[in-house]
From Swiss-Prot:
<dbReference type="GO" id="GO:0140114">
    <property type="term" value="P:cellular detoxification of fluoride"/>
</dbReference>
<keyword id="KW-0406">Ion transport</keyword>
<feature type="transmembrane region" description="Helical">
    <location>
        <begin position="4"/>
        <end position="24"/>
    </location>
</feature>
<keyword id="KW-1133">Transmembrane helix</keyword>
<keyword id="KW-0472">Membrane</keyword>
<feature type="transmembrane region" description="Helical">
    <location>
        <begin position="38"/>
        <end position="58"/>
    </location>
</feature>
<feature type="binding site">
    <location>
        <position position="78"/>
    </location>
    <ligand>
        <name>Na(+)</name>
    </ligand>
</feature>
<comment type="similarity">
    <text>Belongs to the fluoride channel Fluc/FEX (TC 1.A.43) family.</text>
</comment>
<dbReference type="InterPro" id="IPR003691">
    <property type="entry name" value="FluC"/>
</dbReference>
<keyword id="KW-1003">Cell membrane</keyword>
<protein>
    <recommendedName>
        <fullName>Fluoride-specific ion channel FluC</fullName>
    </recommendedName>
</protein>
<keyword id="KW-0479">Metal-binding</keyword>
<dbReference type="GO" id="GO:0005886">
    <property type="term" value="C:plasma membrane"/>
</dbReference>
<dbReference type="GO" id="GO:0046872">
    <property type="term" value="F:metal ion binding"/>
</dbReference>
<keyword id="KW-0813">Transport</keyword>
<feature type="binding site">
    <location>
        <position position="81"/>
    </location>
    <ligand>
        <name>Na(+)</name>
    </ligand>
</feature>
<feature type="transmembrane region" description="Helical">
    <location>
        <begin position="71"/>
        <end position="91"/>
    </location>
</feature>
């Protein structure tokens, strides 16, 4: 597969990931309101879980081609998950004086995202 084909597939994965992030974020606002950045937390945890699955899938040769790793890892997950939004959410919480929510957001994103990546990895490594 040529470089331009791979770039096209990465871009497609990125478009799907970005649209997914928007939809998940909007759904979280409908469910929980805007008082806490649930959308960012959700996409980061889900994306970390999928990344764990993806890495294990390559280790177990379930997905053995490099283009899939790039399309899913760089494209889809790169657009789905977001450290910049996570950072901005915390700046806004800090400006509002919501230090407890800011600390909770940081703790939940770090602990749940790392846990989700580990769980996803372990699920396929035991296969």
């Amino acid at each position: 597969m040529g470089q331009f084909s791979i770039l096209g597939f990465i871009a497609l994965g990125g478009a799907i990931g970005a649209c997914s992030r928007y939809l998940v974020s909007e759904f979280c606002v409908l469910l929980f309101g805007r008082g806490f950045p649930y959308g960012t937390l959700t996409v980061n945890v889900v994306g970390s879980f999928i990344m764990g699955l993806l890495i294990a899938a390559f280790e177990n040769e379930i997905l053995a081609t490099e283009p899939w790793r790039q399309v899913i890892g760089l494209g889809f997950l790169g657009a789905l998950t977001t450290f910049s939004t996570f950072s901005m959410d915390n700046v806004l919480l800090m400006q509002q004086g919501a230090f407890f929510k800011m600390g909770l957001n940081i703790l939940l994103n770090v602990v749940l995202s790392i846990s989700a990546a580990w769980i996803g990895f372990q699920l396929l490594m035991r296969s």
